[in-house]
Amino acid sequence: MRRLVLLLAISLLLYQDLPVRSEFELDRICGYGTARCRKKCRSQEYRIGRCPNTFACCLRKWDESLLNRTKP
């Protein structure tokens, strides 16, 4: 009887849909500290690779006017 209860408990635990990824893994830093892990990159971001949790590694786009600035 104990084995039956134990098998039932184990099967119920295995039947539950356990989360594979936690929400804490979202917004992790990737890309040598310059980008973020996201499910989908935002419109102002480039996808530069994949994070260890298989999300996209998203780098924010640069403003062209900031890159071509010269001091007067």
Curated annotation (Swiss-Prot):
Residues 1-22 form the signal peptide. GO terms for biological process: defense response to bacterium; innate immune response. Has antimicrobial activity. The gene is DEFB104A. It comes from the Eukaryota. It comes from Gorilla gorilla gorilla. It is found in: Secreted. Belongs to the beta-defensin family. Keywords: Antibiotic, Antimicrobial, Defensin, Disulfide bond, Secreted, Signal. Pfam families: Defensin_beta_2 (PF13841). One of its GO terms (cellular component) is extracellular region. Its main location: secreted. This is Beta-defensin 104A. Disulfide bonds join C30-C57, C37-C51, C41-C58.
